Amino acid sequence: MKLGELAAHLGCPVEGNPDVEIRGLASIQQAGPGELSFIESEKYARFIKLTRAEALILDWRTPVSKVPCIRSEQPRLTFAHALELFYQPRRPAPGIHPTAILGANVQLGENVHLGAYVVIGDDVTIGPEAVIYPNCTIYNDVRIGVRTVVHANCVLHERTKIGDECIVQSGAVVGGEGFGFVPTPEGTWHKMPQSGYVRVEDQVEIGSNAAIDRPSVGFTHIGRGTKIDNLVMVGHGCEIGEHCLLVGQVGLAGGVKLGRNVVLAGQVGVAGHAAIGDRTVVSAQSGIPSDVEPGTVVSGSPALPHALWLRTSALIRRLPELFQNLRDLQRKVALLQQRLDSGHH
């Protein structure tokens, strides 16, 4: 595809030769002849001189280079759209593999694919054009929506409801028993029955080896368009709003509530029943012990407003120096006190 044709598909203008041929896409460091890449802002303009890419996607502020370019307000998003034109994941053909095992009253929509060794319980409904890859286990009473893809080795526990156009990556477990135990007078732990379920709305993505638990009663809810990374733990009874982003190794204790468009960076931990408001951003490795107001950016453990955390972190790095200064001052004060005392006598 010529660069000009690609730009027309993307709805963006071209600077430079529109007739260069684009055969693929790659990162700025790895791109070579015939490949398109991007940089997100002028902050990374130094890579333009080093790249061997045939053409680039640039924002309007990045200086014009000798490399032909497509101009965009959002280069990363435009690159994603370009990638969709070149890369179409191969979908398996509709059908049921002969090794798949289906329980009673299973309802399959049109053009469903069930891979090898898939095991499906009773009273399961799978929507049209859904794809279930090999070795998945789907318990009783599960509902899976239209065009949802469940990758290999996933487990969907009883009563789980997955919406339309979701993606569940390999190894994820959705709807497993919540971690519910009640202390007894004898000092033991009594298991609380976990009779609830997990409800996942449309266009949610769940990463590899993520775990989303069901509660004792009611349901755990994942809002529409939310993206959950690998190794994320969502505890029983959590309520996650629409279009949230949970990055790798985030852990939510039971009953946590997230508003809309909340971003939790890697390894964030949230204490039980804490509520995090809409559009909040939590920096990596932060600990959230209690509620967070909407629209804030917090960092640290326990989490503080980001600006305060930056100042605190700067002071922490200076603590050895400040401590030594304090010791020096203490010694000087002690010497002054001795001289004063000697003068009085």
Curated annotation (Swiss-Prot):
UniProt cross-references to SUPFAM superfamilies, sorted A to Z: Trimeric LpxA-like enzymes (SSF51161)
Oligomeric form and interacting partners: Homotrimer.
Name of the protein in its database record: UDP-3-O-acylglucosamine N-acyltransferase 3
Catalytically driven reaction(s): a UDP-3-O-[(3R)-3-hydroxyacyl]-alpha-D-glucosamine + a (3R)-hydroxyacyl-[ACP] = a UDP-2-N,3-O-bis[(3R)-3-hydroxyacyl]-alpha-D-glucosamine + holo-[ACP] + H(+)
Function: Catalyzes the N-acylation of UDP-3-O-acylglucosamine using 3-hydroxyacyl-ACP as the acyl donor. Is involved in the biosynthesis of lipid A, a phosphorylated glycolipid that anchors the lipopolysaccharide to the outer membrane of the cell.
Listed pathway(s): Bacterial outer membrane biogenesis; LPS lipid A biosynthesis
GO MF terms, alphabetically ordered: N-acyltransferase activity; structural constituent of carboxysome shell
Gene3D superfamilies: Hexapeptide repeat proteins, MurE/MurF, N-terminal domain
InterPro entries tied to this protein: Hexapep, LpxD, Trimer_LpxA-like_sf, UDP_GlcNAc_AcTrfase_non-rep
GO cellular component: carboxysome; membrane
Acyltransferase in keyword set: yes
NCBIfam families: lipid_A_lpxD, PRK00892.1
Keywords: Acyltransferase, Lipid A biosynthesis, Lipid biosynthesis, Lipid metabolism, Repeat, Transferase
GO BP, one annotated term: lipid A biosynthetic process
Family affiliation: Belongs to the transferase hexapeptide repeat family. LpxD subfamily.
Active-site residues annotated for this sequence: 236 (proton acceptor)
Catalytic activity, EC: 2.3.1.191
